[in-house]
Design a protein with these regions (language model features):
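Amidase signature
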Residues: 2-4, 148-173, 336-496
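Intrinsically disordered, low-complexity proline-rich tandem-repeat tracts
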Residues: 6-31
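Surface-exposed, charged secondary-structure patches
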Residues: 38, 69-70, 77-124
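Short, solvent-exposed secondary-structure junction/capping segments
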Residues: 40, 44-51, 59-75, 278
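Hydrophobic pocket/interface hotspot
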Residues: 46, 58-59, 66, 79, ...
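Gly/Ser-rich catalytic/binding loops embedded in alpha/beta enzyme cores
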Residues: 105-107, 114-115, 129-271
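Structural helix-boundary/capping segments
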Residues: 146-152, 268, 273, 279-364, ...
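General beta-strand structural signal in soluble alpha/beta enzymes
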Residues: 180, 222-227, 275-277, 393-395, ...
Protein backbone atom coordinates (compact mmCIF):
# COMPACT_ATOMS: atom_id res chain seq x y z
CA UNK A 1 0.00 0.00 0.00
CA UNK A 2 1.25 3.50 -0.73
CA UNK A 3 0.47 6.70 1.17
CA UNK A 4 -0.48 4.66 4.23
CA UNK A 5 -0.37 7.72 6.49
CA UNK A 6 -2.44 9.91 4.22
CA UNK A 7 0.59 12.07 3.49
CA UNK A 8 1.31 13.43 0.06
CA UNK A 9 2.97 10.72 -2.02
CA UNK A 10 6.48 11.38 -3.24
CA UNK A 11 6.25 12.81 -6.76
CA UNK A 12 7.47 10.52 -9.50
CA UNK A 13 9.82 12.57 -11.63
CA UNK A 14 11.02 11.15 -14.94
CA UNK A 15 14.76 10.92 -15.41
CA UNK A 16 16.18 13.76 -17.50
CA UNK A 17 15.55 13.23 -21.18
CA UNK A 18 19.22 13.09 -22.13
CA UNK A 19 20.27 11.49 -25.39
CA UNK A 20 20.82 7.77 -25.24
CA UNK A 21 24.50 6.93 -24.90
CA UNK A 22 26.19 5.71 -28.02
CA UNK A 23 26.47 1.96 -27.74
CA UNK A 24 28.00 -0.69 -29.88
CA UNK A 25 25.44 -2.95 -31.43
CA UNK A 26 24.75 -5.88 -29.09
CA UNK A 27 26.25 -9.02 -30.47
CA UNK A 28 23.83 -11.12 -32.46
CA UNK A 29 23.47 -14.78 -31.46
CA UNK A 30 25.56 -17.20 -33.47
CA UNK A 31 23.93 -17.84 -36.80
CA UNK A 32 21.52 -14.90 -36.54
CA UNK A 33 21.41 -12.57 -39.54
CA UNK A 34 23.28 -9.29 -39.18
CA UNK A 35 21.26 -6.07 -39.16
CA UNK A 36 21.82 -4.07 -42.36
CA UNK A 37 23.89 -0.99 -41.59
CA UNK A 38 21.31 1.48 -42.93
CA UNK A 39 18.52 -0.15 -40.90
CA UNK A 40 20.64 -0.06 -37.73
CA UNK A 41 21.41 3.60 -38.38
CA UNK A 42 17.69 4.35 -38.73
CA UNK A 43 16.93 2.45 -35.52
CA UNK A 44 19.63 4.33 -33.59
CA UNK A 45 18.39 7.68 -34.90
CA UNK A 46 14.86 6.77 -33.84
CA UNK A 47 16.10 5.89 -30.34
CA UNK A 48 17.84 9.25 -30.04
CA UNK A 49 14.67 11.01 -31.13
CA UNK A 50 12.45 9.14 -28.69
CA UNK A 51 14.68 9.81 -25.68
CA UNK A 52 15.01 13.49 -26.69
CA UNK A 53 11.23 13.62 -27.35
CA UNK A 54 11.86 15.12 -30.79
CA UNK A 55 8.26 15.01 -32.00
CA UNK A 56 8.99 16.06 -35.58
CA UNK A 57 11.64 13.39 -35.98
CA UNK A 58 9.42 10.75 -34.40
CA UNK A 59 6.57 11.63 -36.75
CA UNK A 60 9.00 11.32 -39.64
CA UNK A 61 10.10 7.82 -38.61
CA UNK A 62 6.55 6.40 -38.73
CA UNK A 63 5.17 5.61 -42.16
CA UNK A 64 2.49 8.05 -43.30
CA UNK A 65 -1.06 6.96 -43.92
CA UNK A 66 -4.00 5.32 -42.17
CA UNK A 67 -2.53 1.79 -41.97
CA UNK A 68 0.41 2.44 -39.64
CA UNK A 69 -0.01 0.74 -36.25
CA UNK A 70 1.24 1.34 -32.71
CA UNK A 71 0.15 -0.66 -29.68
CA UNK A 72 0.99 -0.83 -26.00
CA UNK A 73 -0.68 -1.96 -22.79
CA UNK A 74 -3.30 0.78 -23.17
CA UNK A 75 -4.49 -0.42 -26.58
CA UNK A 76 -3.98 0.00 -30.32
CA UNK A 77 -3.57 3.23 -32.30
CA UNK A 78 -4.39 3.00 -36.00
CA UNK A 79 -3.07 5.55 -38.48
CA UNK A 80 -0.19 8.02 -38.47
CA UNK A 81 -2.37 10.90 -37.26
CA UNK A 82 -3.63 8.99 -34.22
CA UNK A 83 -0.08 7.97 -33.30
CA UNK A 84 1.18 11.52 -33.70
CA UNK A 85 -1.63 12.89 -31.52
CA UNK A 86 -0.89 10.40 -28.77
CA UNK A 87 2.81 11.19 -28.83
CA UNK A 88 2.21 14.94 -28.56
CA UNK A 89 0.54 14.41 -25.18
CA UNK A 90 2.73 11.63 -23.82
CA UNK A 91 5.85 13.62 -22.95
CA UNK A 92 9.33 12.17 -23.11
CA UNK A 93 10.41 8.73 -21.97
CA UNK A 94 13.00 8.17 -19.22
CA UNK A 95 16.63 7.77 -20.26
CA UNK A 96 17.41 4.26 -21.44
CA UNK A 97 19.92 2.12 -23.27
CA UNK A 98 19.35 -0.71 -25.72
CA UNK A 99 20.40 -3.90 -23.98
CA UNK A 100 19.45 -6.32 -26.77
CA UNK A 101 18.34 -6.07 -30.37
CA UNK A 102 17.26 -8.87 -32.69
CA UNK A 103 16.69 -8.71 -36.44
CA UNK A 104 14.64 -10.96 -38.67
CA UNK A 105 14.28 -10.14 -42.37
CA UNK A 106 10.72 -10.27 -43.68
CA UNK A 107 11.70 -9.53 -47.28
CA UNK A 108 14.20 -7.52 -49.26
CA UNK A 109 12.69 -4.24 -48.06
CA UNK A 110 11.06 -5.16 -44.76
CA UNK A 111 12.30 -6.36 -41.41
CA UNK A 112 11.28 -7.19 -37.85
CA UNK A 113 13.30 -5.65 -35.00
CA UNK A 114 12.82 -6.62 -31.37
CA UNK A 115 14.80 -4.74 -28.74
CA UNK A 116 15.08 -4.66 -24.96
CA UNK A 117 15.47 -1.29 -23.24
CA UNK A 118 17.36 -0.95 -19.96
CA UNK A 119 16.18 2.18 -18.14
CA UNK A 120 18.75 4.24 -16.26
CA UNK A 121 16.32 4.47 -13.35
CA UNK A 122 15.77 0.70 -13.29
CA UNK A 123 13.47 -1.67 -15.10
CA UNK A 124 13.28 -3.03 -18.63
CA UNK A 125 10.95 -2.59 -21.58
CA UNK A 126 10.40 -4.37 -24.89
CA UNK A 127 9.88 -2.87 -28.36
CA UNK A 128 8.71 -4.83 -31.40
CA UNK A 129 8.86 -2.95 -34.71
CA UNK A 130 8.20 -3.74 -38.34
CA UNK A 131 10.38 -1.55 -40.57
CA UNK A 132 9.88 -1.10 -44.30
CA UNK A 133 12.08 0.60 -46.87
CA UNK A 134 9.86 3.22 -48.52
CA UNK A 135 11.28 5.55 -51.17
CA UNK A 136 14.78 4.66 -50.05
CA UNK A 137 14.18 5.24 -46.29
CA UNK A 138 13.55 2.77 -43.49
CA UNK A 139 10.24 3.65 -41.77
CA UNK A 140 8.21 1.98 -39.02
CA UNK A 141 4.91 0.55 -40.25
CA UNK A 142 3.94 -1.27 -37.05
CA UNK A 143 5.18 -1.11 -33.47
CA UNK A 144 4.29 -2.62 -30.12
CA UNK A 145 5.74 -1.32 -26.86
CA UNK A 146 5.78 -3.19 -23.57
CA UNK A 147 6.82 -0.58 -20.98
CA UNK A 148 8.53 -1.28 -17.70
CA UNK A 149 6.05 -2.20 -14.99
CA UNK A 150 5.06 0.85 -12.92
CA UNK A 151 4.45 0.66 -9.19
CA UNK A 152 1.07 2.26 -9.87
CA UNK A 153 -0.51 4.44 -12.52
CA UNK A 154 -0.52 7.85 -10.84
CA UNK A 155 -2.96 9.21 -13.40
CA UNK A 156 -5.57 6.77 -12.03
CA UNK A 157 -4.56 6.27 -8.40
CA UNK A 158 -3.53 8.53 -5.56
CA UNK A 159 -3.04 5.54 -3.26
CA UNK A 160 -3.60 1.86 -3.94
CA UNK A 161 -3.23 -1.49 -2.20
CA UNK A 162 -4.18 -5.15 -2.43
CA UNK A 163 -6.33 -4.40 -0.62
CA UNK A 164 -5.97 -0.81 0.46
CA UNK A 165 -8.56 -1.43 3.16
CA UNK A 166 -10.25 -4.75 3.92
CA UNK A 167 -14.01 -4.86 4.31
CA UNK A 168 -16.13 -7.40 6.16
CA UNK A 169 -15.20 -10.97 5.30
CA UNK A 170 -18.80 -11.85 4.46
CA UNK A 171 -21.66 -9.97 2.86
CA UNK A 172 -23.51 -9.38 -0.41
CA UNK A 173 -20.51 -7.58 -1.94
CA UNK A 174 -17.81 -9.94 -0.64
CA UNK A 175 -14.96 -10.36 -3.10
CA UNK A 176 -15.58 -7.06 -4.91
CA UNK A 177 -13.07 -4.21 -4.90
CA UNK A 178 -13.79 -0.48 -4.89
CA UNK A 179 -12.01 2.55 -6.35
CA UNK A 180 -13.01 5.53 -4.18
CA UNK A 181 -13.06 8.96 -5.78
CA UNK A 182 -10.74 11.35 -3.96
CA UNK A 183 -13.62 13.34 -2.49
CA UNK A 184 -14.66 10.87 0.21
CA UNK A 185 -13.43 10.69 3.78
CA UNK A 186 -11.55 7.56 4.83
CA UNK A 187 -10.49 7.55 8.47
CA UNK A 188 -6.77 8.27 8.79
CA UNK A 189 -6.41 9.59 5.24
CA UNK A 190 -6.68 13.01 3.67
CA UNK A 191 -9.09 14.17 0.98
CA UNK A 192 -7.08 15.46 -1.97
CA UNK A 193 -9.80 16.74 -4.35
CA UNK A 194 -7.49 16.26 -7.34
CA UNK A 195 -5.16 19.06 -6.25
CA UNK A 196 -1.71 18.56 -4.67
CA UNK A 197 -1.77 21.85 -2.76
CA UNK A 198 -5.14 21.00 -1.22
CA UNK A 199 -3.89 17.51 -0.33
CA UNK A 200 -0.73 18.88 1.28
CA UNK A 201 -2.72 21.13 3.62
CA UNK A 202 -5.56 18.72 4.40
CA UNK A 203 -5.79 16.93 7.72
CA UNK A 204 -6.38 13.19 8.01
CA UNK A 205 -10.06 12.39 8.33
CA UNK A 206 -11.35 11.19 11.69
CA UNK A 207 -14.27 9.16 10.33
CA UNK A 208 -15.11 7.27 7.16
CA UNK A 209 -17.89 8.58 4.93
CA UNK A 210 -21.12 6.52 5.16
CA UNK A 211 -21.02 5.87 1.40
CA UNK A 212 -17.63 4.18 1.85
CA UNK A 213 -18.55 2.42 5.09
CA UNK A 214 -21.67 0.90 3.51
CA UNK A 215 -19.57 -0.87 0.89
CA UNK A 216 -17.04 -2.12 3.46
CA UNK A 217 -19.81 -3.42 5.71
CA UNK A 218 -21.23 -5.39 2.77
CA UNK A 219 -17.93 -7.21 2.26
CA UNK A 220 -16.31 -5.12 -0.46
CA UNK A 221 -12.69 -4.07 0.04
CA UNK A 222 -11.13 -0.82 -1.07
CA UNK A 223 -8.60 -1.07 -3.89
CA UNK A 224 -7.55 2.53 -3.37
CA UNK A 225 -8.21 6.25 -3.64
CA UNK A 226 -8.71 7.22 -7.27
CA UNK A 227 -8.14 10.51 -9.04
CA UNK A 228 -10.74 13.19 -9.68
CA UNK A 229 -10.75 16.28 -11.84
CA UNK A 230 -9.87 19.24 -9.61
CA UNK A 231 -12.66 19.86 -7.09
CA UNK A 232 -14.93 17.76 -9.38
CA UNK A 233 -15.45 20.85 -11.56
CA UNK A 234 -15.04 19.23 -14.99
CA UNK A 235 -16.50 16.49 -17.16
CA UNK A 236 -13.45 15.92 -19.40
CA UNK A 237 -11.42 13.75 -17.05
CA UNK A 238 -8.12 15.61 -17.33
CA UNK A 239 -5.93 16.86 -14.51
CA UNK A 240 -2.98 19.21 -15.06
CA UNK A 241 -1.21 18.01 -11.90
CA UNK A 242 -1.40 14.23 -12.20
CA UNK A 243 -2.11 13.66 -15.88
CA UNK A 244 -5.11 12.26 -17.71
CA UNK A 245 -6.21 8.72 -16.80
CA UNK A 246 -6.36 6.38 -19.79
CA UNK A 247 -9.71 5.67 -21.38
CA UNK A 248 -10.18 1.94 -20.93
CA UNK A 249 -12.25 1.63 -24.12
CA UNK A 250 -10.74 4.11 -26.61
CA UNK A 251 -6.99 4.60 -26.81
CA UNK A 252 -6.02 8.28 -26.81
CA UNK A 253 -9.49 9.50 -25.86
CA UNK A 254 -10.57 11.47 -22.82
CA UNK A 255 -11.79 9.26 -19.95
CA UNK A 256 -14.64 11.55 -18.91
CA UNK A 257 -14.90 13.26 -15.56
CA UNK A 258 -14.93 14.32 -12.98
CA UNK A 259 -14.99 10.69 -11.78
CA UNK A 260 -12.12 9.90 -14.14
CA UNK A 261 -10.00 7.79 -11.79
CA UNK A 262 -12.76 5.44 -10.61
CA UNK A 263 -14.05 5.05 -14.17
CA UNK A 264 -10.64 4.18 -15.61
CA UNK A 265 -9.90 1.84 -12.71
CA UNK A 266 -13.12 -0.09 -13.34
CA UNK A 267 -12.78 -0.07 -17.13
CA UNK A 268 -9.21 -1.41 -16.92
CA UNK A 269 -10.12 -4.11 -14.40
CA UNK A 270 -8.24 -2.57 -11.46
CA UNK A 271 -11.46 -2.47 -9.42
CA UNK A 272 -15.00 -3.83 -9.68
CA UNK A 273 -16.86 -0.78 -8.38
CA UNK A 274 -16.18 2.92 -8.71
CA UNK A 275 -17.60 5.00 -5.85
CA UNK A 276 -18.18 8.36 -7.47
CA UNK A 277 -20.14 11.59 -7.47
CA UNK A 278 -22.35 13.19 -10.09
CA UNK A 279 -23.21 16.89 -10.03
CA UNK A 280 -23.73 17.63 -13.72
CA UNK A 281 -22.81 14.28 -15.26
CA UNK A 282 -19.63 13.12 -13.55
CA UNK A 283 -20.78 9.50 -13.38
CA UNK A 284 -22.81 9.33 -16.57
CA UNK A 285 -20.20 10.92 -18.87
CA UNK A 286 -17.24 8.64 -17.98
CA UNK A 287 -19.60 5.66 -18.02
CA UNK A 288 -20.55 6.48 -21.60
CA UNK A 289 -17.01 7.28 -22.70
CA UNK A 290 -15.57 4.04 -21.30
CA UNK A 291 -18.39 1.56 -21.92
CA UNK A 292 -19.46 1.20 -18.29
CA UNK A 293 -22.67 1.07 -16.31
CA UNK A 294 -23.11 4.19 -14.21
CA UNK A 295 -25.87 5.17 -11.78
CA UNK A 296 -26.54 8.70 -10.58
CA UNK A 297 -28.87 8.20 -7.63
CA UNK A 298 -31.84 10.31 -6.59
CA UNK A 299 -30.62 13.51 -4.97
CA UNK A 300 -30.25 13.12 -1.18
CA UNK A 301 -30.95 9.37 -1.31
CA UNK A 302 -27.36 8.45 -0.37
CA UNK A 303 -25.95 10.38 2.62
CA UNK A 304 -23.30 12.90 1.57
CA UNK A 305 -21.63 13.23 4.96
CA UNK A 306 -17.88 12.94 4.61
CA UNK A 307 -17.96 13.93 0.93
CA UNK A 308 -16.30 17.12 -0.28
CA UNK A 309 -19.09 19.10 -1.98
CA UNK A 310 -19.09 20.97 -5.26
CA UNK A 311 -22.72 22.15 -5.40
CA UNK A 312 -24.96 20.68 -2.72
CA UNK A 313 -28.20 21.34 -4.61
CA UNK A 314 -27.11 18.84 -7.27
CA UNK A 315 -24.32 16.69 -5.78
CA UNK A 316 -25.23 13.04 -5.54
CA UNK A 317 -23.42 9.77 -5.01
CA UNK A 318 -23.43 6.75 -7.28
CA UNK A 319 -21.42 3.88 -8.71
CA UNK A 320 -19.66 2.69 -11.85
CA UNK A 321 -19.40 -0.99 -12.79
CA UNK A 322 -18.56 -3.11 -15.81
CA UNK A 323 -21.88 -4.97 -15.81
CA UNK A 324 -25.47 -4.52 -14.77
CA UNK A 325 -25.52 -7.39 -12.31
CA UNK A 326 -22.78 -5.84 -10.17
CA UNK A 327 -24.52 -2.47 -10.25
CA UNK A 328 -27.72 -4.17 -9.12
CA UNK A 329 -25.93 -5.82 -6.20
CA UNK A 330 -24.51 -2.49 -5.10
CA UNK A 331 -27.80 -0.63 -5.46
CA UNK A 332 -29.78 -3.36 -3.70
CA UNK A 333 -27.46 -3.18 -0.71
CA UNK A 334 -26.74 0.52 -0.47
CA UNK A 335 -30.27 1.73 -1.19
CA UNK A 336 -32.58 -0.90 0.28
CA UNK A 337 -31.83 -1.16 3.99
CA UNK A 338 -33.29 1.05 6.68
CA UNK A 339 -30.24 2.37 8.47
CA UNK A 340 -26.72 1.09 8.84
CA UNK A 341 -27.57 -1.54 11.47
CA UNK A 342 -30.75 -2.86 9.87
CA UNK A 343 -31.02 -6.11 7.95
CA UNK A 344 -34.52 -5.39 6.67
CA UNK A 345 -34.89 -4.59 2.99
CA UNK A 346 -36.91 -1.44 2.44
CA UNK A 347 -37.39 -0.93 -1.27
CA UNK A 348 -39.88 1.92 -1.07
CA UNK A 349 -40.75 3.24 -4.52
CA UNK A 350 -38.58 0.50 -6.04
CA UNK A 351 -40.81 -2.23 -4.65
CA UNK A 352 -42.72 -2.30 -7.93
CA UNK A 353 -41.24 -2.50 -11.41
CA UNK A 354 -41.17 0.61 -13.55
CA UNK A 355 -43.42 0.67 -16.62
CA UNK A 356 -42.16 -0.77 -19.89
CA UNK A 357 -42.94 2.59 -21.50
CA UNK A 358 -40.38 5.12 -22.66
CA UNK A 359 -40.39 8.75 -23.70
CA UNK A 360 -37.75 10.29 -25.96
CA UNK A 361 -36.97 14.00 -25.40
CA UNK A 362 -36.76 15.69 -28.79
CA UNK A 363 -34.65 18.62 -27.60
CA UNK A 364 -32.02 16.27 -26.19
CA UNK A 365 -31.74 14.45 -29.51
CA UNK A 366 -30.99 17.80 -31.16
CA UNK A 367 -27.73 17.86 -29.14
CA UNK A 368 -26.63 14.44 -30.40
CA UNK A 369 -24.07 13.94 -33.15
CA UNK A 370 -25.55 12.49 -36.40
CA UNK A 371 -23.84 9.09 -36.21
CA UNK A 372 -24.91 8.62 -32.59
CA UNK A 373 -28.47 9.68 -33.34
CA UNK A 374 -28.60 7.17 -36.19
CA UNK A 375 -27.31 4.36 -33.95
CA UNK A 376 -29.84 5.30 -31.27
CA UNK A 377 -32.71 5.33 -33.77
CA UNK A 378 -31.70 1.89 -35.04
CA UNK A 379 -31.68 0.58 -31.48
CA UNK A 380 -35.18 1.88 -30.72
CA UNK A 381 -36.51 0.50 -33.99
CA UNK A 382 -35.06 -2.93 -33.24
CA UNK A 383 -36.50 -2.93 -29.72
CA UNK A 384 -39.92 -1.90 -31.00
CA UNK A 385 -39.85 -4.83 -33.44
CA UNK A 386 -38.71 -7.37 -30.84
CA UNK A 387 -40.70 -10.08 -29.07
CA UNK A 388 -40.93 -7.88 -25.96
CA UNK A 389 -41.59 -4.50 -27.54
CA UNK A 390 -41.63 -1.44 -25.28
CA UNK A 391 -43.60 1.61 -26.31
CA UNK A 392 -41.80 4.79 -27.31
CA UNK A 393 -43.19 8.29 -27.78
CA UNK A 394 -41.63 11.70 -28.20
CA UNK A 395 -41.86 14.39 -25.52
CA UNK A 396 -40.68 17.96 -25.22
CA UNK A 397 -38.49 19.31 -22.41
CA UNK A 398 -38.43 22.97 -23.32
CA UNK A 399 -35.38 25.18 -23.80
CA UNK A 400 -32.27 23.22 -22.81
CA UNK A 401 -30.12 26.34 -23.09
CA UNK A 402 -32.24 28.04 -20.45
CA UNK A 403 -32.11 24.95 -18.23
CA UNK A 404 -28.36 24.69 -18.49
CA UNK A 405 -27.84 28.41 -17.93
CA UNK A 406 -29.89 28.38 -14.73
CA UNK A 407 -28.26 25.15 -13.57
CA UNK A 408 -24.76 26.49 -14.20
CA UNK A 409 -25.54 29.67 -12.26
CA UNK A 410 -26.71 27.83 -9.15
CA UNK A 411 -23.87 25.32 -9.44
CA UNK A 412 -21.30 28.10 -9.76
CA UNK A 413 -22.69 30.09 -6.83
CA UNK A 414 -22.51 27.06 -4.55
CA UNK A 415 -19.08 26.01 -5.83
CA UNK A 416 -17.68 29.46 -5.05
CA UNK A 417 -19.20 29.42 -1.55
CA UNK A 418 -17.59 26.04 -0.95
CA UNK A 419 -14.14 26.71 -2.38
CA UNK A 420 -13.80 30.44 -3.00
CA UNK A 421 -11.93 31.25 0.21
CA UNK A 422 -9.38 28.53 -0.46
CA UNK A 423 -8.92 29.64 -4.08
CA UNK A 424 -8.39 33.26 -3.07
CA UNK A 425 -5.74 32.12 -0.61
CA UNK A 426 -4.01 29.94 -3.23
CA UNK A 427 -3.81 31.87 -6.50
CA UNK A 428 -2.48 29.76 -9.33
CA UNK A 429 -3.00 26.48 -7.48
CA UNK A 430 -5.58 25.07 -9.92
CA UNK A 431 -5.34 24.41 -13.65
CA UNK A 432 -6.43 27.03 -16.20
CA UNK A 433 -9.77 25.46 -17.21
CA UNK A 434 -10.95 24.93 -13.64
CA UNK A 435 -9.62 28.34 -12.61
CA UNK A 436 -11.70 29.97 -15.34
CA UNK A 437 -14.86 28.20 -14.17
CA UNK A 438 -14.26 29.40 -10.64
CA UNK A 439 -13.53 32.92 -11.91
CA UNK A 440 -16.92 33.00 -13.65
CA UNK A 441 -18.54 31.52 -10.54
CA UNK A 442 -17.06 34.27 -8.38
CA UNK A 443 -19.00 36.89 -10.36
CA UNK A 444 -22.44 35.38 -9.66
CA UNK A 445 -24.53 37.65 -7.45
CA UNK A 446 -27.18 36.68 -4.93
CA UNK A 447 -29.78 38.10 -7.31
CA UNK A 448 -28.43 35.94 -10.17
CA UNK A 449 -28.58 32.84 -8.00
CA UNK A 450 -32.11 33.52 -6.75
CA UNK A 451 -33.36 34.15 -10.28
CA UNK A 452 -31.74 30.95 -11.52
CA UNK A 453 -33.29 28.90 -8.72
CA UNK A 454 -36.69 30.32 -9.63
CA UNK A 455 -36.12 29.27 -13.26
CA UNK A 456 -35.24 25.73 -12.25
CA UNK A 457 -38.41 25.10 -10.24
CA UNK A 458 -40.80 24.72 -13.21
CA UNK A 459 -38.15 22.75 -15.11
CA UNK A 460 -37.88 20.24 -12.28
CA UNK A 461 -41.67 20.03 -12.08
CA UNK A 462 -41.91 19.38 -15.83
CA UNK A 463 -39.37 16.56 -15.71
CA UNK A 464 -41.09 14.97 -12.73
CA UNK A 465 -44.32 15.00 -14.73
CA UNK A 466 -42.62 13.54 -17.82
CA UNK A 467 -41.31 10.50 -15.91
CA UNK A 468 -44.42 9.97 -13.80
CA UNK A 469 -45.81 7.22 -16.02
CA UNK A 470 -42.84 6.38 -18.21
CA UNK A 471 -39.05 6.31 -18.29
CA UNK A 472 -37.07 8.81 -20.30
CA UNK A 473 -34.50 7.38 -22.76
CA UNK A 474 -31.83 9.11 -24.84
CA UNK A 475 -28.10 8.84 -25.63
CA UNK A 476 -26.11 9.68 -22.51
CA UNK A 477 -23.79 12.09 -24.34
CA UNK A 478 -23.58 13.59 -27.85
CA UNK A 479 -21.15 10.97 -29.15
CA UNK A 480 -18.02 8.92 -28.45
CA UNK A 481 -15.28 10.22 -26.18
CA UNK A 482 -13.30 13.02 -27.84
CA UNK A 483 -9.63 12.48 -28.42
CA UNK A 484 -7.35 14.11 -25.90
CA UNK A 485 -6.09 16.43 -28.64
CA UNK A 486 -9.59 17.67 -29.54
CA UNK A 487 -11.11 21.05 -28.72
CA UNK A 488 -13.72 19.91 -26.23
CA UNK A 489 -15.49 23.20 -25.48
CA UNK A 490 -18.34 22.60 -27.94
CA UNK A 491 -18.67 18.96 -26.85
CA UNK A 492 -18.72 20.03 -23.20
CA UNK A 493 -21.53 22.52 -23.81
CA UNK A 494 -23.67 20.00 -25.72
CA UNK A 495 -23.00 17.31 -23.12
CA UNK A 496 -24.06 19.45 -20.18
CA UNK A 497 -27.27 20.41 -21.95
CA UNK A 498 -28.06 16.70 -22.03
CA UNK A 499 -26.97 15.82 -18.49
CA UNK A 500 -28.07 18.90 -16.51
CA UNK A 501 -31.88 18.42 -16.63
CA UNK A 502 -31.91 15.18 -14.60
CA UNK A 503 -29.49 16.74 -12.13
CA UNK A 504 -31.60 19.88 -11.84
CA UNK A 505 -34.67 17.76 -11.08
CA UNK A 506 -32.82 15.46 -8.65
CA UNK A 507 -33.84 12.36 -10.61
CA UNK A 508 -32.02 9.02 -10.83
CA UNK A 509 -30.30 8.28 -14.13
CA UNK A 510 -28.44 5.21 -15.33
CA UNK A 511 -26.10 4.99 -18.33
CA UNK A 512 -26.02 1.63 -20.12
CA UNK A 513 -23.22 0.77 -22.61
CA UNK A 514 -25.44 -0.13 -25.56
CA UNK A 515 -24.30 1.88 -28.60
CA UNK A 516 -21.17 1.60 -30.75
CA UNK A 517 -20.28 4.56 -32.93
CA UNK A 518 -17.15 4.33 -35.03
CA UNK A 519 -16.01 1.43 -32.88
CA UNK A 520 -16.31 3.45 -29.65
CA UNK A 521 -18.93 3.06 -26.90
CA UNK A 522 -21.76 5.50 -26.29
CA UNK A 523 -24.19 5.03 -23.44
CA UNK A 524 -27.96 5.03 -23.43
CA UNK A 525 -29.42 6.92 -20.47
CA UNK A 526 -32.62 6.02 -18.64
CA UNK A 527 -34.18 8.54 -16.23
CA UNK A 528 -37.04 7.68 -13.87
CA UNK A 529 -38.97 9.26 -11.04
CA UNK A 530 -37.30 10.05 -7.72
CA UNK A 531 -36.68 7.14 -5.36
CA UNK A 532 -37.01 4.39 -7.97
CA UNK A 533 -33.26 3.82 -8.30
CA UNK A 534 -33.27 0.07 -7.61
CA UNK A 535 -36.17 -0.48 -9.98
CA UNK A 536 -34.40 1.68 -12.56
CA UNK A 537 -31.37 -0.61 -12.53
CA UNK A 538 -33.69 -3.62 -12.88
CA UNK A 539 -35.36 -1.98 -15.87
CA UNK A 540 -31.99 -1.05 -17.38
CA UNK A 541 -30.87 -4.68 -17.18
CA UNK A 542 -34.07 -5.81 -18.91
CA UNK A 543 -33.55 -3.12 -21.56
CA UNK A 544 -29.92 -4.17 -22.08
CA UNK A 545 -30.78 -7.88 -22.23
CA UNK A 546 -33.37 -7.26 -24.92
CA UNK A 547 -30.99 -5.04 -26.88
CA UNK A 548 -28.25 -7.67 -26.66
CA UNK A 549 -30.59 -10.41 -27.81
CA UNK A 550 -31.58 -8.66 -31.04
CA UNK A 551 -28.10 -7.73 -32.24
Amino acid sequence: MTDATGATPEPITPEPATPAPAMPAPAAPAGAPAIPADLRAAFDAYERAIVANDLDALDDFFAPGPETLRGDTAGLLVGHDAISGFRALRGGVPAREIAEIHYRPLGSDSALLMSVSQFVGGGRGLQTQVWQRIDGRWLITAAHVTPRTPALDRTIWRSVGDPFLQGAWEGPLAGLTVAVKDLFAIAGFRIGAGNPTYLEEARPEKATAPAVADLLRAGASLRGIARTDEFAYSIAGDNVHYGTPPNGAVVGALPGGSSSGPASAVALGHADIGLATDTAGSIRVPASYQGLWGLRTTHDLVPRQGMLPLAQSFDTIGWLTRDGETLQRVADWCLSYDGSSSTENVYGASGDDLPWRFVVPEEVLDCVEPATREAFSRLLAALAASDDPPSFRAVHMGDLDATFSAFRTVQGAEAWRNDGDWLRAHPGAVGPAVAERFRVASQITAYDEAAARAELEPIAALLAEVVDGAVMVFPTVPGPAPLRTADVDAVRAATLRMTAPAAAAGLPAVSIPLLRVGGAPVGVCLVSRAGTDIALVRLARRFAALAGGIR
